[in-house]
Amino acid sequence: MNILFWGTPAYAVPTLDALHGAGHTIVGVVTQPDRRRGRGKQLVPSPVKARAEELGLPVFTPERIRRDDDCKAKLAALGADASVVVAFGQILPKDVLEQPPLGSWNGHGSLLPRWRGAGPIQWALLEGDQETGVGIMAMEEGLDTGPVLLEQRTPIELLDTSIALAERLSALTAELMVQAMPLIEAAGTGPEDERLAKLNVRVQAEGSTYARMLEKQDFQLDWSASALSIHRKVMGLHPGAFTQLHDKRLKVLRTEPLIERLQDQLSTEGRSLVGQWPTGGHPPGTILAMIEDLGLVVSSSGCPLLIREAQLEGKARSTAPALLQQLKATLGDRFGEV
């Protein structure tokens, strides 16, 4: 098949590689324009653009595809059979979606209709979902509302970070998209409703949830919340969740709630950490213990939380005992106090 690929972040690269490796002709790659990054504010290409150039593929970088008629004309001239979209970063207009005769297909990182929108992986972790997955969806004008052709599920582990989960879902998306292509090709051209009927797609049920864009305040830890809620924020927003200790900002990178289901791995010198520090009587965010080879035990609602890895403002990320030395904290100090 002749495929026009749309994608931007590293998450999309495995799908591009998989389609290319499966023998499909990638007639073009559409990605977001280069952005200025880092201290030097140098222009940096997207991971998809960098990979496409390594593969010798033509690349297009429209600032706003909806308004770029010149780019639309160039893409139409490529003669793609289908468009494949994975985390492109712009909403595609109807005329672009309907251009390829075999349709436009999206690899989405959730079990639709749960977590439509731009941050499904983060929100699945934040809300404590037990499983998630990926779906190959026929695209339409609505945001992630199209019928689903293929879907694959995966469990969410308590200690998964958003980065680890994204890597799993990215690989699943690549596998599933390769499986989808011969099915889409076999359905042939013609009216969309007839093609989709041949493919026996699943129309999304009611009861959708929306993965809204995250804002700065979402990343700040609230120590009055439950240990599980704080842990989910740390893992779901990795590596961006933060707190304060006195006048310093601390990025919290890895935590473990001191709960029974983690009892076997939460031990030191053969003694379980679970149940050692009742939180009653301690204000939220209070440092209850500093364990040299593990980290800090901090009070929260319900049970304490173990901070295993963090990054103090102006320092490199670190684990115990270096973290304890950098913080210069004492028992009874409180996170969240400025």
From Swiss-Prot:
InterPro entries the record matches: Fmt, Formyl_trans_C, Formyl_transf_N, Formyl_transf_N_sf, Formyl_transferase-like_C_sf, Met-tRNA-FMT_C, Met-tRNA-FMT_N
UniProt key word Protein biosynthesis: yes
Chain residues that bind (6S)-5,6,7,8-tetrahydrofolate: 110-113
Reaction it catalyzes: L-methionyl-tRNA(fMet) + (6R)-10-formyltetrahydrofolate = N-formyl-L-methionyl-tRNA(fMet) + (6S)-5,6,7,8-tetrahydrofolate + H(+)
Annotated keywords: Protein biosynthesis, Transferase
SUPFAM superfamilies linked to this entry: FMT C-terminal domain-like, Formyltransferase
One Pfam family from the record: Formyl_trans_N
The keyword Protein biosynthesis is assigned to this record: yes
Gene Ontology molecular function, alphabetical: methionyl-tRNA formyltransferase activity
UniProt-listed Enzyme Commission number(s): 2.1.2.9
Gene Ontology cellular component annotations, sorted alphabetically: cytosol
Family recorded in the similarity comment: Belongs to the Fmt family.
Protein task: Attaches a formyl group to the free amino group of methionyl-tRNA(fMet). The formyl group appears to play a dual role in the initiator identity of N-formylmethionyl-tRNA by promoting its recognition by IF2 and preventing the misappropriation of this tRNA by the elongation apparatus.
Name of the protein this chain belongs to: Methionyl-tRNA formyltransferase
Annotated gene: fmt
